[in-house]
UniProtKB/Swiss-Prot annotation:
Residues 91-239 form the FAS1 domain. The keyword Signal applies. This is FAS1 domain-containing protein AN1527. Its main location: other. Residues 1-24 form the signal peptide. Keywords: Signal, Vacuole. InterPro entries: FAS1_dom_sf (IPR036378), FAS1_domain (IPR000782), Mug57-like (IPR040200). It is found in: Vacuole. It comes from Emericella nidulans (strain FGSC A4 / ATCC 38163 / CBS 112.46 / NRRL 194 / M139) (Aspergillus nidulans).
């Protein structure tokens, strides 16, 4: 009986020491540490001010399409007046609402680069219809908005947009791109041919419950804004 008690005591001490040792192990010291660069991951940058074409190119290259920003089909319910302070009559203009319209911030930023376009979007005496491409439509272009395949063919890929003359070509191309999406009238009736600020002739037609810009048959996702000097139509494509 005494021998059994001694054996039990020895076993108890053995297990007690084993458990105590296990609890004292520096377990957390052996876990893999997260690399410092991941711990201090930089935050994404917000929209920056664009002062020249090089800055604009860099900014455009870093833009990503908005995810999940699905627009409703065009209808009377989609037309709305935005209550923001605007021009001389204290009514909002296209220039006021364009930067606030969801999913088109790339095109909205481009309009502010050209005084003639921006002035027209502020003008309360001349209505316009802005065909604003979605961010994803601009991102999906096979080339940048300031690029023209004819320039590459004529001047070569290395020289097309280099130097002062190249920069001037890029600016002209970009202004042409922006102007091609501003129709110089509103209201704009179905089947009525209208001219853009870039000189293009466009019409629109309804097919079922959808609106298409002709002749390129670009779908209108929504009539997003209706203000004192016109409307903003969000389109799923670009005017070439």
């Amino acid at each position: 009986m005494r021998q059994l008690s001694t054996t039990a005591l020895v076993l108890f001490l053995f297990f007690y020491c084993s458990i105590s040792t296990a609890w004292s192990l520096p377990y957390f010291a052996y876990r893999k540490r997260i690399p410092e660069p991941l711990l201090n991951k930089p935050r994404s940058r917000h929209a920056r001010s664009i002062e020249d074409l090089d800055g604009l190119k860099e900014w455009l290259s870093n833009q990503q399409p908005l995810r999940g920003a699905v627009m409703a089909p065009p209808s009377e319910d989609n037309k709305r007046t935005v209550t923001v302070k605007g021009g001389a009559n204290n009514e909002p203009t296209i220039s006021d609402v364009l930067p606030k319209t969801r999913g088109i911030n790339i095109y909205a930023s481009l309009t502010r680069q050209f005084e003639t376009v921006e002035r027209r979007l502020k003008d309360q005496t001349q209505n316009v219809t802005v065909l604003a491409p979605r961010n994803s439509a601009i991102q999906d272009l096979p080339h940048k908005p300031w690029e023209n395949p004819d320039d590459y063919e004529k001047f070569g890929e290395m020289n097309a947009y280099e130097g002062d003359k190249g920069q001037d070509r890029a600016k002209r191309n970009l202004e042409r791109f922006v102007s091609a999406h501003v129709v110089a009238q509103s209201p704009w009736r179905e089947g009525e041919e209208a001219e853009t600020l870039g000189g293009d002739k466009l019409t629109w037609r309804k097919d079922g419950d959808r609106i298409y810009i002709e002749p390129e048959r670009i779908r209108v996702e929504s009539i997003a804004e209706q203000v004192s000097n016109g409307e903003v139509w969000v389109i799923d494509g670009v005017i070439n």
